[in-house]
Amino acid sequence: EEELAKAQQALNDAEPLASGGSDEGVVNGFYAAFHAAQAALYDRGIEPSSHGAIRNRFGEALVLDGSVDRSQGRLLTTLADLRQQVDYGYEPIDADVATLLDRTRSFVESMAALVDSEPGE
């Protein structure tokens, strides 16, 4: 539940940044997806130790077993790559931040539904 709350807060923080034209909305969008993915993994008893491990374990534990669609795994990877570009790149990103945040909101909702629908812990 704590990770899902963090995901929701990151989404809430991302929206004004994106509507103001800031690429920083992507960073918050990544953290929203990151925390939601982490919640789904924790629910399955998986405790990854890094951002990269979360992406890998998400693919192994949730995408490959069919619990989530491959497009959700790709979104997590896309957001991670864009976050790196925003944080460390010198050029603006070439992405529609509003659309990414819409997809991220759906991702967070899907992970919350997954956590609520399956017994965990």
Regions picked out by a protein language model, each given a short descriptive name:
Residues 1-121:
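Terminal alpha-helical segments
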